[in-house]
């Protein structure tokens, strides 16, 4: 009985692995560092705009 349970888990897990390996990435591949740097740059631009933009 114990060996039957182990084999069922492996088969179901193998299907998930196969599904995720075949998944296609649609969109640009960006480096995570680039995203962080862009966020920091936007934050700096917003803060500078708040200082120099007349209310």
Curated annotation (Swiss-Prot):
Membrane topology: Single-pass membrane protein
Superkingdom of origin organism: Archaea
Gene Ontology BP, a term: protein transport
Record field: transmembrane: 32-51
GO cellular component, one term: plasma membrane
InterPro entries with a match to the protein in the record: Preprot_translocase_SecG, SecG/Sec61-beta/Sbh
Location within or outside the cell: Cell membrane
Entry annotated with the keyword Protein transport: yes
Alphabetized HAMAP family for the sequence: SecG
Assembly and binders: Component of the protein translocase complex. Heterotrimer consisting of alpha (SecY), beta (SecG) and gamma (SecE) subunits. Can form oligomers of the heterotrimer.
Membership in a protein family: Belongs to the SEC61-beta family.
Name of this protein: Preprotein translocase subunit SecG
Gene: secG
